[in-house]
Amino acid sequence: MLTSITGINWGDEGKGRMVDLLSQDYDIVARYQGGDNAGHTVKNERGKFVLNLIPSGILRPDVVCVMGGGMVIDPEHLEKEITSLTEKGVEISPKNLKISDRATITMPFHVAQDGLEEERLSKTGAQFGSTKRGIAYSYGDKYKKKTLRMGDLVHMDAGVRKRLETIVESKNLTMEKIYGQKPVSVDEMWAWCEKYSKLFAPYICDVGDYLDKADREGKKIMFEAQLGALRDIDFGIYPYTSSSNTVSAYAPIGAGIPGHKLNLSIGIMKAYSSCVGEGPFTTELAMTEAEKDVLREHGHEYGAATGRPRRVGPFDAVASRYGVQCQGCDELALTLLDVLDYMEEVPIVTAYKLTDGSTTTRFPMGKTLDDAQPVVETVPGWRCDITGVRRFEDLPQAAQNYVTRLEELVGCKIKYISVGPERDACIVRK
């Protein structure tokens, strides 16, 4: 049984809390793309956890977590994340955390280059809003075949040293000529690799073989995505995307079992919209700055990885319908419905108005999207606390109507509705 948990929008939809909830019925949770540039926040009886690299299933003692070959992994950040978790009583060992030998290493010079390039672009207003975690440069060097993989940390021999020398030589051309920086030291990079070789070699293995056997044995495997459909490198709002494929079709590939097919695709979407970074975000035009400030505070909309204030707006049915299509969703989870408890009327962006005066419900790209204006429908709010509700029929009628209206607009059934951050604060519809 292979299930994907993916984001419908720009990321920050609440995937971590849903993985934490649903993983109780799974044997394995695998991340298949991305790095430490976004965070999954989980709140349970042991406290609040922010996970950037490790799958959210790590909070379940009987679940094995896998970091797939489609990921880019900063060993330095991974060490800190493991330390943070173990300090809160989470047990982590090679028995419950397996790292793909094919995953790309985010090196210190990737992080440095990311910050330098964003600074250079900002001088002309051309920045992308990067998290400065080195993600794009890790993936870029992966495709240029000028970086190391986690498997290299297992065999730190003369061959790996020679490759590192070639990589650093090439990188120094960029660091010195473009950014005017001091050259990267091969010896320092080798010492850095040796440190993390000793730490992570026991965790590194052929996760594809492990997942293949598990699937054939009938184990239940969940694939956890980072970010959302609109950040996918191919299907997102280019160039304001991440540098990996966030769509569900890539899940078996990035995890390590490309010949296997998904059995279930669950999409996660918020009851409103949020976005971190640059690029068109049509829905934010449907609210005043004051209204957005109130929504941001009610939703605590600040990046889990960066702390940056998120851009916010009403639920965007145009973007969400496109996200559902990209993810091939069989069912949906609607998160943070309780955040809207304060609204007398709840706005929904149902279409975009284009510069020629026409309207569309299809998600456009390029300049058409840049210039689009939101078409807004308002529905009655419920103006009461719903955090204690656990059955759909016990929700206020206005809240029920809002959920069914979103189903109509995106064309997919909403099975799960979260009404609070706690693990059990969720309605499961029959």
Model-derived features: where do they sit?
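Non-transmembrane, aqueous-exposed alpha-helical and coiled segments at domain scale
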Residues: M1-K430
